[in-house]
């Protein structure tokens, strides 16, 4: 079955092409740390031959606590992104939270991301669609895979079909997430075979029901990522940090930066294997 290709500059993203890595840090903590992390990702992905898009947030507008670090903000964040692009020649993905942010962010980065908690907000979807940028839609934890077609349709009505879908787990009772591996193929089907990627970092969140920040299961990142890659996906979304215990956001779910290369070697091996298989239709 023909898969839709979404192009991010010279990077082609599709379910049957070699996987694209969307990776970086959760939130911009400082200019220097962003440069350090981006440089490491670029070095490793170039060595392994993996297409790469740098990810970071300039504002974490949905933190659990009013006291949690949110990021440097729009103006300073765009300056850091511009420097990263000029220094390393990378493509960049970041999220927007308000309609007014869509165009200023799209003027700087290559992919704008619709956060999971906001994925059904029509005003935001319409503003993002109008930019003409490539869009990454995070599947809300409370939305079934089959409902993602409605969100894609909103973007199409707004004149933008350059949509990538991203799964980051589903609510499993209170304060826990699980990943339905059958959901990936459903998301492909309802979106017209749009590229589907897997955010393994945020799928590992596991909250303290009375805490002010998300916990996580970093020790299981490799096994969950291996399971997702075995489905046959367009890309993998992963956040890393040189010192996860002291990261300002989602450290408990972040891959230690020093483990990036061996981690990606495993992901590439699985992706190469799975996409080398002949298509097998077991529906009839």
Curated annotation (Swiss-Prot):
It holds the Pfam family DAHP_synth_1. Its main location: cytoplasm. GO terms for cellular component: cytosol; protein-containing complex. The gene is kdsA. Keywords: Cytoplasm, Lipopolysaccharide biosynthesis, Transferase. This is 2-dehydro-3-deoxyphosphooctonate aldolase. NCBIfam families: KDO8P_synth, PRK05198.1, PRK12457.1. Belongs to the KdsA family. Its EC number is 2.5.1.55.
């Amino acid at each position: 079955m023909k898969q839709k290709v979404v192009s991010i500059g010279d990077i082609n993203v599709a379910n049957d092409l070699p996987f694209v890595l969307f990776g970086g840090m959760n939130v911009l903590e400082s200019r220097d740390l962003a440069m350090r992390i981006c440089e490491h990702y670029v070095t490793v992905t170039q060595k392994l031959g993996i297409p790469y898009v740098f990810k970071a947030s300039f504002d974490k507008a949905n933190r659990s606590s009013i006291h949690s670090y949110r990021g440097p903000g729009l103006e300073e964040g765009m300056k850091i992104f511009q420097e990263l692009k000029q220094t390393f020649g990378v493509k960049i993905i970041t999220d927007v939270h308000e309609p007014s942010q869509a165009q200023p962010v799209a003027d700087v980065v290559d992919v704008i991301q619709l956060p999971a908690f906001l994925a059904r907000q029509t005003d935001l979807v319409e503003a993002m669609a109008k930019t003409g940028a490539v869009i990454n839609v995070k599947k809300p934890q409370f939305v079934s895979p089959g409902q993602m077609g409605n969100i894609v349709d909103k973007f199409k009505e707004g004149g933008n079909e350059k949509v990538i879908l991203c799964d980051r787990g589903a609510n499993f009772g209170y304060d826990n997430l699980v990943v339905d591996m059958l959901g990936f193929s459903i998301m492909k089907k309802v979106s017209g075979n749009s590229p589907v990627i897997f955010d393994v970092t945020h799928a590992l969140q596991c909250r303290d029901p009375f805490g002010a920040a998300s916990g996580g299961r970093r020790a299981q990142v490799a096994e969950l990522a291996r399971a997702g890659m075995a489905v046959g996906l367009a890309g993998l979304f992963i956040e890393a940090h040189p010192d996860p215990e002291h990261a300002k956001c989602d450290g408990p779910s972040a891959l230690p930066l020093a483990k990036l290369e061996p981690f990606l070697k495993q992901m590439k091996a699985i992706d190469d294997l799975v996409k080398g298989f002949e298509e097998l239709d077991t529906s009839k």
